[in-house]
Regions:
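Basic, nucleic-acid-interacting segments
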Residues: 2-298
Length: 298
C-alpha cells in the first residue's frame, strides 16, 4: 500500500494522534518591508540583467568541536560551484562578504520587537548577533546572522494555547535563478533582507491545531510592516512520532496544505520505524502533500 493510500485509509478510520505520540511545531520566516538588515541597500528584487557575476566554492572544515558537520560534508561532496549575480548600483561589498556588516537597521529591529510583543513574548534586554552555518551557498559568508528578540510567548487558538519559544531577527538568503547538479546561480538582491523568524513550541498534537496556529500568526504579521506576495513568507514544519527523530519539512506557502502533508509524513515515519530506521532529516513539501529528501539534519 502506498503512502497516499495509507494516508487516505487513516483519514477514513480516524487518526489517533495521541496514541502515535505526534509532536509538531512551526518555524515561520517573514520578510520585513524595510531596507536590508546590515547594509544600506534597498532590498527590492530586480528582473533586469545583472552587471557582474562572482564564482565561489564551498570547502568543508572542522568547527569548534574539531569535527566536520555531517550536513556540510554532504554538501561539499557534491562539488558544486556557486555563482552570485549583482548590480553596480544596488549590491555592496557587505553582500559579497568583502566588508564587515554595518549597524543593524533600526526600523527592522522595531518591527521585530512589535511582532514579539503581539505574540506575548518576553523581550530580551540584551541580545547578541549569532552566526548559523549555511551550507547551500545561499549566503556568501557561509553563515546567517541572527539574533533573538523575544522568548516564552504564546498565541490563542480554538484548540488552546500554542507556545512561542522564540522570535528572532535574521537576514534572508540570496535567491536561486538557475540550478543544476554542479552549479547554482544566486542573485544577491534578496540577501540581507530582514526576516523575522517565529518558532513555536513542539506542543501541537494535531495537524489542525498546527494549521490554525499558522493562520493566527499570519494575521499578526499582516498587522506589521511586512512584505506581501509569493516568497515573502516561508513556513516550515517539524514533525515526529513516538520513536522517530524530528523531521523538518520546508516550503509551505499555504497552511491548508499542512494537514495532508503531516498525515503523509506520519505514514512515512511509521514505515521507517517498521524498517528499523528513525533518523531525522530535512525534507521539502510538494504540492500533492508528499515530501522529498533534501539533506541530513544538521
Amino acid at each position: 500500500m502506498s503512502e497516499n493510500d495509507k494516508s487516505e485509509k487513516m483519514k477514513k478510520e480516524g487518526i489517533d494522534y495521541s496514541k502515535m505520540g505526534l509532536m509538531s511545531g512551526l518555524e515561520i520566516h517573514q520578510q520585513l518591508d524595510t531596507g536590508k538588515l546590515f547594509c544600506k541597500c534597498s532590498g527590492y528584487l530586480r528582473q533586469d540583467e545583472p552587471d557582474f557575476v562572482v564564482k565561489r566554492k564551498l570547502h568543508a572544515v572542522a568547527g569548534e568541536t574539531g569535527e566536520i558537520d555531517s550536513a556540510v560534508e554532504h554538501e561539499a561532496a557534491l562539488d558544486r560551484e556557486f555563482y552570485y549575480q549583482g548590480y553596480n548600483d544596488s549590491t555592496c561589498l557587505i553582500e559579497l562578504d568583502e566588508e564587515p556588516p554595518k549597524q543593524v537597521n533600526q526600523e527592522a529591529l522595531d518591527e521585530a520587537i512589535k511582532i514579539a510583543l503581539l505574540t506575548n513574548c518576553e523581550i530580551y534586554q540584551i541580545t547578541q548577533v549569532m552566526r548559523k552555518t549555511v551550507i547551500d551557498g545561499s549566503n556568501t559568508s557561509g553563515f546567517q546572522r541572527t539574533f533573538l528578540i523575544g522568548h516564552d510567548g504564546y498565541i490563542e487558538t480554538s484548540f488552546g494555547k500554542v507556545g512561542i519559544d522564540s522570535v528572532a531577527l535574521e537576514e534572508d538568503a540570496a535567491r536561486i535563478v538557475e540550478k543544476d547538479d554542479k552549479k547554482i546561480v544566486y542573485r544577491l538582491d534578496r540577501l540581507g533582507i530582514p526576516l523575522v523568524e517565529i518558532g513555536t513550541a513542539p506542543d501541537m498534537d494535531t495537524p489542525e491545531k498546527m494549521k490554525e496556529a499558522a493562520l493566527k500568526i499570519g494575521e499578526i504579521l499582516r498587522a506589521c510592516k511586512v512584505k506581501r506576495g509569493i516568497g515573502t513568507i516561508r513556513q516550515d514544519v517539524n514533525v515526529s512520532i513516538k520513536g522517530h527523530d524530528r523531521v523538518e519539512i520546508k516550503g509551505f506557502q499555504d497552511p491548508r496544505m499542512m494537514v495532508e502533508t503531516v498525515d503523509k509524513e506520519i505514514v512515512r515515519q511509521q514505515k521507517e520505524l517498521e524498517q528499523g530506521k528513525k533518523m531525522g532529516e530535512v525534507r521539502n513539501a510538494k504540492e500533492d502533500g508528499s515530501t522529498e529528501f533534501m539533506r541530513p539534519m544538521p
